[in-house]
Amino acid sequence: MPRPRKRQTGTAGPDRKKLSGKRTKTENSESTSVKLENSSLEMTTTFKNGGKNLSNYWLMKSEPESRLEKGIDMKFSIEDLKAQPKQTACWDGVRNYQARNFLRAMKLEDEAFFYHSNCKQPGIVGLMKIVKEAYPDHTQFEKSNPHYDPSSKEDDPKWSMVDVQFVRMMKRFIPLEELKTYHQAHKATGGPLKSMTLFTRQRLSVQPLTQEEFDFILSLEETEPS
């Protein structure tokens, strides 16, 4: 999500907030048809009611290293989140319909892994929680913002964001390569990470997790790196 930083959020409410944030390279601004939007919504519903039981767990990607887009630094690390007032920020700049629909499915107190992406060593660095459910993403209306979408209207906004709050750092960094090793092994054995969205839909910057996936990843904190 782009902008130099995700800034502090306001109090809960339906009105649009003047906040800024960052996105990952995996999110691309796109003028997608209504058909694609509806398809993504159907896929989100399938995740919730069909194949995957979403429970209340997510993985959310952001870039910890500086990268300029239209003169704006896209960097937003977990340390940046910790530095925000109340360690809380909006998660703006998502421009993928399925990822947006996942944001809209989030509920208060849902838990999410903070995942550093598009960097030298990608992986899970910490935990955060949802402290405000989906509301219009202000950056879609800001002409100077890389996430500006001229096709979106204030009375019918296309894009949403949520507010997240830092919970804690992981007891140890869980790198992508370690997760990939487990994913490959679990595909053969039927283990918890056999269908993890991180590997089946890699480009999504907001991803659902089953409780089984979430609990298994948490358990890795207590083990030595594989």
From Swiss-Prot:
A motif (Nuclear localization signal) lies at residues 5-10. GO terms for cellular component: nucleus. InterPro entries: 5hmC_binding, EVE_domain, PUA-like_sf, THYN1-like_EVE. Its main location: nucleus. Phosphorylated. Residues 29-38 have a biased composition (Polar residues). The keyword Nucleus applies. It is found in: Nucleus. Transmembrane segments: none annotated. Residues 14-28 have a biased composition (Basic and acidic residues). Expressed in the medulla containing mature thymocytes, but not the cortex having immature thymocytes (at protein level). Abundant expression seen in testis, liver, brain and kidney with lower levels of the expression in thymus, spleen, heart and stomach. Residues 1-38 are annotated as: Disordered. SUPFAM superfamilies: PUA domain-like. Keywords: Nucleus, Phosphoprotein. Induction: Down-regulated upon induction of apoptosis. Specifically binds 5-hydroxymethylcytosine (5hmC), suggesting that it acts as a specific reader of 5hmC. This is Thymocyte nuclear protein 1. It comes from Mus musculus (Mouse).
